[in-house]
C-alpha cells in the first residue's frame, strides 16, 4: 500500500460513535430504553430494575446506562430465559400499541418551547417547578393524543447536584452529562451526519448547534447543544449550564432557544397551528416567526397579526423581579440586524419589549415582548391570573387590570409519573377502568369511599417508611463521601421520628419565592415548631 507524504504527516480525523452491542433478540429492550415512556410505566421500569437491582441503582435508574454496563454474557443469557422474554414481549406490545395511536387531528397542533424540562432525573435539563411542569405537559400531551412537538436546550452540566454536609451546609456539584448514555438520539441528515443548525448572532458570527431528540411517548422533544468543535471557546459554553453564566450568556441561550428553535423546526419541515412559549425565555420564537412571514412577502403589520393569532404565552412568575430584562446595549449587540429584516426601526423593536414605549431608560423585557406578540396569555392559577393582570396592567393603558386578556390554567401534574406503584394498584383495584383517562371525574373519585380507612392509612405509613429509608440512604452516602464521623450520622438517624409530619419545600429558596410568609404569624410558627408532634422542614437553596 502506498501513502502520499500528505497522508503520512497530517492526521486524518474521523468521528466515530461507540455504543454497546446487544443480542438481536434484545433490540426491543434497547428501543424502549430510548423512549421516556418507561418513566411512567411501572411494568417497563420493573423489567429493567428486576434484572439487577443493585446495578439499576448504580446506573441511577437510567436504562440506557444500565444496558451498557451489563455483561454481554448476562445479556445473552436473558435471550434464553423464557420467562423474561415473555415479560419483555408483553411490555413491548403495550409500548407499540401506545405509540401506534394517531394524534387527535380535530384539535390544534402545538409547538412548545421551554428553557427546561423535568422529564426524569437521568436527563438533567431542569432545575425546578417550571421544568417539572413542562415535562408533565409533554407526558400528558402524549397520553392525550395531542399533536405536539417541543424544543429546548441540551445542557452539558445541567443544574447542580446537591449534597448536605453534617453542618447542614449545601454542597454543590456539577457533573457533565455523557450524551451517549442518555435516553436521547441524534437527529440525522440524509447524508448520515448529525443535523446542525447555524444560528446568526448579530452580523459578525454564527453559533452552530447540534440537534438531538428525546422521545417522550408520542411527543418529540428537540434539544439544541452548542458544545461542539464548530464553535469558538466563547460559544461552546452557551449550553453548559441551565441559567448559568452572566446576562450575556442568558441572552445567548434565549436566542438559541427562540430563534434557533424555530430554525430547527423549519429545517425539519414542522409547522404547527399554535406556538406555545413557556415563560419569557422562549419569547424570541416570535422574532423568527415574524422574519419568516416577512420573507414570504408580508409587511410587518400583516406578519404580526398572523404571529399574534397563533401564539400562546404562559407566565409563571408572580413578581417583576422574576422576569428577564436586557440592557439596550447588550440587546443591540446581538439583535441589531433584525430591524432591517422586520422592516422597522431599532426603537420600534425595543418598544416591543417595553411597558412604556419611548422610555429610553427601560430595558427590553422578554415577558413584555411575549405579551405583545401573543393573543393568548395565561397564568398558572386563578389567583396568579389576578396577580399577572395587575403586573402587566401598564401594557393596556385605559383598561382595568381585570379587563385585560390574561387568563389562567391551573397547574397540574402527570398522574402516572407522580403516583407510586402502590397507589396505582390501589386505584386500579377500586376505581372505574376509565380512571387513568378521566382523572378529574368526581364521580369516579367517589369510589374512594369504598376503600377501608385502615387500608389507606397503612398505605401512607408504608410509603413514609420507604421515604425515611431513602433519606437515610441518601444522607449516609453524602456523608460518607464527606468523610463524616459515622457515629454522628447514626445519632442523627436515631432521632429521626417516623411519626412526625414531614414537609418538603420543593422549590428553590430564592427571595421572590416569598418564604418570609412563614414569619407573618410568629406565634403560630412557634406553636408549630415547638409542638410535641414536630415538623421537619428542608428547603433547597440556589447554588449562588
Summary of predicted features, one role per range:
Residues 1-540:
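Catalytic cores of carbohydrate-active enzymes across secretory and cytosolic contexts
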Residues 544:
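Extracytoplasmic Gram-positive cell-surface binding/anchoring modules and repeats
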